[in-house]
Amino acid sequence: MSKGNILFILYGILTLTLCGGDAFHLIPRVIRAFKGSSDRIKKQLGIGLQVSSITMTAFYILLLYIWKFTFYEMKAPVALEMVIWLSALVRIVICFLPQNNWCSDEGNRKLSIIRNAVFAVTGIGVIILYALSGNTYGYHMTRMVAAILISFGCYLPVTLLSKKMPKIGLLMIPKTCAYIWVIVMGLQLLFAAAC
């Protein structure tokens, strides 16, 4: 299988992971913002948050492998790759803990801070990789760094404040737009490789 085919498959999986994961929490957030909350919406949002927390972690692991196949002549520092993998696995394990209380109003602030701090480590690791590659092959991957920074800039306030200020959850929309930008960059790379 050629490098182009592998990248095409990885970007396809990345897109499905993004769309599937975000749909689980965006739809209940939009409904809650316009119609108010109910027990049903709270449960849907709680499950959606858990699912999207796991899928977004997988999203960053996929970005790691996309980087490796795009910049195949570059080697990711072993320590950095280990940090990305370890932090991602720790976050996924934390996401499965019932103590998260995903479907309750209270949640678990301590676990939320821990799992999102670990997620930030994963994201920073991926940011470093794309910053290292920069404009290699004329791909302008510094834009990937910008997209990830925007997504975290929108995600963190929602994580910290959405229980007290539900409408801040609408910041997940620009976060999703930043991730769509990641997908568009992938399509541009694939079309450039095909030419």
Language-model segment annotations:
Residues L7-Y11, F71-W85, L132-A147:
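Transmembrane helix-loop-helix
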Residues I13, T17-G20, F24-I27, V51, ...:
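Lipid-exposed faces of alpha-helical membrane segments in multi-pass integral membrane proteins
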Residues K3-A79, L170-I173, I180:
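Early transmembrane hairpin module of multi-pass membrane proteins
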Residues E106-A117, Y130-A146, P166-I173:
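Membrane-helix boundary/juxtamembrane motif in polytopic membrane proteins
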Residues I54-V126:
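Membrane-proximal helix-loop-helix units in multi-pass membrane proteins
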Residues V184-C195:
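Juxtamembrane boundary at the C-terminal end of a transmembrane helix
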Residues M1, Y65, I92-N101, A117-Y139, ...:
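Alpha-helical transmembrane segments in multipass membrane proteins, preferentially the mid-helix core
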Residues S38-I47, E73-A79, N101-K110, L132-G138, ...:
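Short juxtamembrane and helix-loop transition motifs at transmembrane-helix boundaries
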